[in-house]
Each structure stands twice: as structure tokens, then as C-alpha cells.
Amino acid sequence: MLDRSRLRIAIQKSGRLSKESQQLLEQCGIKINLQQQRLLAFAENMAIDIMRVRDDDIPGLVMDGIVDLGIIGENVLEEALLTRRSQGDNPCYIMLLRLDFGDCRLSMALPIDEPWNGPKSLQGKRIATSYPHLLKQYLDKLGIHFKSCLLNGSVEVAPRAGLADAICDLVSTGATLEANGLHEVEVIYRSKACLIQRSGELSNIKQSLINKLIIRIQGVIQARGSKYIMLHAPAEQLEEIINLLPGAESPTVLPLAGNQHRVAIYMVSNETLFWETMENLKNLGASSILVLPIEKMME
């Protein structure tokens, strides 16, 4: 039985968010041993339990107070909200953070030989989807009448199988659509992974753990989008060089020993550094340019 005094976090057991959710928790310093077939895993160094479940179970577990936190795609969360509201429920949760992974879009797709003249092309069509409420919300706002065909998997095969005229499904690269003779015509919802918390009062111990976890997650996300940069540069080009490298804070600038015309620059840049940027630095007279990844970061 679960120890109710420990913080409970639900993550996807398998699927597109599973690996990155696990990596995020590990990068936050939570030592966990996730065995493939086990529902529960226990952190070795913090009072945290990890529950590994189907992604569409996570919103309900959070809203019903079974777990304290959940990492879930916004698309799954929004569909669960709309489903519960359609049943007369008033679901509650707290959105804590949007995360930096799990990007996808919920899109309409038609057979390649079908013309697209805007949403009106869907009038009276039968549309296969795993997200009936998100689809209905979108098309109702446009005054489009349609028939829904609910499928929980392999939505992209519905037109070829004669089950539907069009589909509404998650798209990452579009390769699966193309392989099934479909083309993406309209994005109706964009989604990322997010961290949600159950509503209601928590113990001071749990709330303290959540606050610590939020700070660590923010640090991990910020570090992923930042680089530590070291270089030597002409003193007279200092301002131009700094403008090429948007930083989290003002850079550290030190004189080079034995050379009063050149300086050493150390800074954290919050933009991904491309080869073009490094070449521009070189053109301004910079040398010994080092770009290093940052594992953790806290301001």
C-alpha cells in the first residue's frame, strides 16, 4: 500500500513522454529504479513515489487526488477536462509548469487526392479521432457539422479502411500521414508536456518537496537552452561580440596577461550557438572560442 505521506508523481509508463519524463526526474536529482513491469517505483533519496500508468489515466489520477503531481501532454489533459465537463463534472487541478519536451500538434488530415478549401471542406464528413471532444470544440466554433468515429489507435488507417473521410490525430513529423496516403491540412491544437498538481491542501512536507522540485525543473530546462562560452577577443570589439551572444547575466570580462588590447570573456548564453554565430565571432577577432554544455543551472 502507498505511504500517503510521500509525494506521488504519475508519469507515462510507455510512449512518447515516458523516457523524457524519467530523464527529467533523474536530472532533478531523484534517484529511482524503474523496472519495466512495475507500476510503482520509489525514490531512494527523497520521499517520492513514481506511478507509471497509461497517459490518459494521468489527468484523472491527479483530478481525483490519487496522485499529487502528473507529467502529461496538454492534449491529453485538455481532452480529459472536456470529457469530464461533458459528463457534468467540475474537474480541478493546478497547472505548475509547461515543460520543454513532448511538442506535437493535433491536426486534421485528408487523403492526398482530396482538395482542401478550409474547414468548410469537413462539412458533413465522418472524421476518425482519439480526441472527440477537442475535435468537437474546434468544429463547433466554426459551425461545422460532422460525424465522429472514435478510434483509440491506428487512426491514420481509417480513410483507407473506409471507416472515415478524414482524421484528426497527433502529428510530429508527418511521416506517418504520408505513409498512409494522407496530408495535413489544419492544426487545431498545439501541445507540450506539462506538470500538473492536484487541487486541495497538501502537507507542509509535500508542498516543500513540490517547491524544491519546481525550482530544480526550471533549472534543468534553463540549462538545456543555455551554453557556457569562453573566448578571447579584441577589447575594442567587446560590445559587438556581447551583442552576438544574448546572456542570462552580464559577462565576466578579464584582461589577458601580457596583452592590454585583448580580453577574456566568460558568459552564459541563453540561445543555441550555431556555427554561423561562431564564424561571426571569429570575424570580429575572437579566438580560443569554447562552447560548453551546462548540466544544471540556478539563478
UniProtKB/Swiss-Prot annotation:
Primary role: Catalyzes the condensation of ATP and 5-phosphoribose 1-diphosphate to form N'-(5'-phosphoribosyl)-ATP (PR-ATP). Has a crucial role in the pathway because the rate of histidine biosynthesis seems to be controlled primarily by regulation of HisG enzymatic activity.
Entry annotated with the keyword Metal-binding: yes
Underlying gene: hisG
A single BP term in Gene Ontology: L-histidine biosynthetic process
Name listed for the protein in its UniProt record: ATP phosphoribosyltransferase
Cofactor: Mg(2+)
Family: Belongs to the ATP phosphoribosyltransferase family. Long subfamily.
Source organism phylogeny: Bacteria, Pseudomonadati, Pseudomonadota, Gammaproteobacteria, Enterobacterales
EC number: 2.4.2.17
Keyword Magnesium in annotation: yes
An example Gene Ontology CC term for this record: cytoplasm
Species for this entry: Blochmanniella pennsylvanica (strain BPEN)
Domain of life from the UniProt record: Bacteria
